[in-house]
Structure formats: structure tokens, C-alpha cells
């Protein structure tokens, strides 16, 4: 899987000056490569800081293995500038996935790389019939179809209004119960 995403035709629509567009190449999405952990960790640390390790979401990642078919990086001119990692979880008895972290280099945020990464995860999860759970900003993630998941019980304190779920088309029953890592 390698997707090439062109620079927007209307640079002003995404906050780019026209002279910036000539210097801004397209970006690609591809599977997370082996050996990229240091760069990915640097992106995530810059986005969330060291306090992220104390958050409830981290409990779902510790000792869990990423799902490589749903996790990806974004590259501009060969450099990793964005990342999304997805993990196997259960919500009650239902298999699901947990999205996070997602991080983009601040210099590249105007390219809508984060949006492309979220859409990639949702499209790939759709093909596998899997829901996607995350802890995040409802207005931002609501654009992609994420809704509150009031019956998903995470393994620690979290603002329940920020626990969101995306469901594949045709799947009407929102999973409920304790959220546990792994399948």
C-alpha cells in the first residue's frame, strides 16, 4: 500500500501561500517501516510531550502489538512527517481497534496529512469490518464519522466525552463494555 496525495489545487483553501506550493511536494502514505521507531517517537513526543505516557490510552498500547495493516506513516521528500498507529483491542466481547497516537510534523500540518491518515485508518478498518476507538477531540474526529462511545469503559480515568468510536457501514450495534488490549 502506497498512496500518493497531491498538493491541493487551491492552496489558499488550506492556508498555503501560492509561493509555498511550489516548494511543497506531495506526500505519500505507506506502512510503518522497520527501524522508524525513533523518528515516530520524536513526532509523537513533539505533539504530546512526556505526559502522554501517564495517560489511560497508553495502557492500551503497553505490551500490545501495532496492527501493521492499519498503521502508516506519511512522507514528504522521503522524510517521515506523520504517523498513525492502530492497536488491537476488545470492547466487551467485540474485536475492535484503537487509534493513537496520530502525529504530524508541525511544519507539514497545513498539508492535511492528519486528515489523510485518519481516512486511511477508517477505509482500511471498513474493509476488515472493524470499528475504531480513540480518545480525541469530538469536533475534529466527528468530521470522519466518529461519535461518542459512552458504553466503552477504558482501563483508567478519561474524559468520557472524548472517547469516540467509528463504525463500519452496516454495523449498527455499538460495542459496549470494558476495553482491553489485544484480541
Residue ranges of predicted features:
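Conserved N-terminal entry element of GNAT/NAT acetyltransferase domains
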Residues: 1-35
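Active-site rim helix/loop that mediates acceptor-substrate recognition in acyltransferases
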Residues: 37, 45-85
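Hydrophobic pocket/interface hotspot
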Residues: 40, 44, 141
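Short loop segments at secondary-structure junctions
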Residues: 76-78, 107, 167-171
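A conserved beta-turn-beta hairpin within the catalytic core of GNAT-like acetyltransferases
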Residues: 89-99, 109
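Conserved acetyl-CoA-binding loop-helix of GNAT-fold acetyltransferases
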Residues: 99, 104, 110-123, 134
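Conserved active-site alpha-helix within GNAT-family acetyltransferase domains
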Residues: 126-160
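C-terminal "cap" of GNAT-fold acetyltransferases
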Residues: 155-183
